[in-house]
Amino acid sequence: MPAMRLTPSNCQLLGEGLDHPESVCLGPDGTVYAGGEAGQVYRLDTTGGQHLVGTTGGFLLGLTLDGAGAIHACDVGNKALVRMSPEGKVTHRATGIAGRPFVNPNHILFDPQGTLYLTDSGDYWQQETGTGYVATVDAQDNAKIFHAGPFMFANGIALHPSGEWLYIAQSTAANIVRIPLARPNGPMEVTHTLPTGTVPDGIAFAADSRLVIGCYKPDAILVGHPDGTVETLFEDPTGELLNRPTNIAIGEGKLYIANLGGWHLTVVEADFQPAPIHRPRLMQAAP
């Protein structure tokens, strides 16, 4: 199927003056959250209102929402995993593992038990072997290595709908790999090989196990099928509507796309339903 070229008539630009949003996530009521390059968390409600929840003073990459309405985010500026309450209060949950500071904390998600998985991308320029890894952080803010990798700039992560696998985008390898959740440091398997020159960033699973892939380069959204094939879903050769797209959130029949190079989110109607998103209530982490 040929890729759809985005135009102003087939997509919506959401948000005004967002500060180069790298990540986006959805609340259970459809509220949209996005991060900014000065540590901002924006809330965009279903009626079109836009509100600045708070700032961390850093640079926010991946973010996700818990069951109490708090945002958890990778703050690469402060090299920390942070939590922002619905009122905007910021606390640092972790800054590294056993004396090993984070280098590039990049993306996060919760599993059904409330454990948070985090990619530390490592050194972008160490492209022969990579230095990235995957960590876990429990509800008491204890961080440890889950998979030592090394990953080649471990970026976006997504939990397979079966709950058995964690998928990771390797930006400098132009591929997607998976690791078993039941086996720390378990075998790493390439599931999707992307076209040469592609820089995958964020990934998100649909309920039918299709994997939506945001590409920092080119300005395109890909879909990875369960059989390992990959096709381009949307593209924007102008770089105006999609501008360095990074992370993606799947809504009911819509994709919400963060544009690190721009000032808005892009919303496109598409034949996708979201895989389960886990938003645990972390009472121990309450401010």
Task: Give the residues covered by each predicted segment.
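A short beta-strand motif characteristic of beta-propeller blades
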Residues: 9-15, 48-54, 90-98, 142-148, ...
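Beta-rich, blade/repeat-based domains predominating
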Residues: 16-29, 38, 56-75, 98-119, ...
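Loop/turn-rich, solvent-exposed surfaces of beta-rich toroidal or solenoidal domains
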Residues: 175, 192-229
